[in-house]
Amino acid sequence: MNYFELFSLLPSYDVDTALLADRYRELQRAVHPDKFANASEQDKRLSVQRTAQINDAFQTLKNPIQRAEHLLALKGLELSHESTTLKDTQFLMQQMDWRESLEEIKHSDDPDSEIAELYDSFEQYAKHITAELKLLLVSELEADHLQAADQIRKLKFMAKLQDELTRVEDALLD
């Protein structure tokens, strides 16, 4: 199912989140199970299924990584539940550096500045990856779609690393 069509949006990495939320509320009102309280059992089931579908679509489209995966799926490249590893050695080296920095924060004399530095490093890298990803997603070339998949894998890794940094920061505050 094309979630962009469901929400009457053009398929794009960039989505107007306010418009997305408005369309979500409109769709929810139209199919909400309460509207079908006196309907047949089949109509009630369909309403519940449609509501779940709308919720899934909304969650996918409001999350940039999931939205990018959906765009690739619409082009025939399915990434969900995959276990492909990245072969980008430069990224793998950067990943190791970030992990070392994360470990060093725990023993640092100035953890706040190191945390801020890592957040900034993550943000800059993610912006770079996202800019490349946007260009690759509009392409019709399969090779570009494969590269886009690698960029998505990097963004997924960055999100996990960001979560780890947040946990380290929270632990220091305790």
From Swiss-Prot:
InterPro entries: DnaJ_domain, HscB, HscB_C_sf, HscB_oligo_C, J_dom_sf. Gene3D superfamilies: DnaJ domain (1.10.287.110), HscB, C-terminal domain (1.20.1280.20). The keyword rRNA-binding does not apply. Residues 2-74 form the J domain. The keyword Chaperone applies. One of its GO terms (molecular function) is protein-folding chaperone binding. One of its GO terms (cellular component) is iron-sulfur cluster transfer complex. GO terms for biological process: [2Fe-2S] cluster assembly; protein complex oligomerization; protein folding. Keywords: Chaperone. Interacts with HscA and stimulates its ATPase activity. Co-chaperone involved in the maturation of iron-sulfur cluster-containing proteins. Seems to help targeting proteins to be folded toward HscA. HAMAP family: HscB. Belongs to the HscB family. This is Co-chaperone protein HscB homolog.
